[in-house]
């Protein structure tokens, strides 16, 4: 498998420090499976973009029954010392779409059994504790759901993290209107 890591550094002042970007991938047990480093091309003020490619032999693929997640650790180093960075969970998988066969996850053709999920939790409102999301997603998975459509807007990051961890596919939605705002009264749809 190949992971493309796109990194961006914004320097507010010029520096003569030796700046490096590092991307390291760890398996679920914490063992390092891939790493790449590159020197930031210049120390000038402004934005620098770098691309790193990590190669993984025999990857453990994420799937619905075994939602295996790696940890990608990205760092900015100045003279060898970490000055910024983050960790991101990463699932490795392949997707195929065919007009006759449908959808395949990791070369396994399957039915997508999805539901629409809105951002609120009924009487709890729109600020939903993670435990409530986890319970709801587990209940959906127990009744055979394998995919969630995020209706009608991007959800809280915790929902995506839980879907990754629990083995649920996601169809994300940017908005429920593409070109014009809702004007249902124009054709009498509001009656």
Region annotations inferred by a language model:
Residues 157, 179-180:
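Generic structural signal for helix capping and beta-alpha/helix-loop junctions
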Residues 1-162, 166-170:
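Secreted/periplasmic carbohydrate-active enzymes, especially glycoside hydrolases
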Residues 165, 182-191:
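Active-site neighborhood of glycoside hydrolase catalytic domains
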Residues 176:
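Short, glycine/acidic-enriched loop or turn micro-motifs at the edges of active sites
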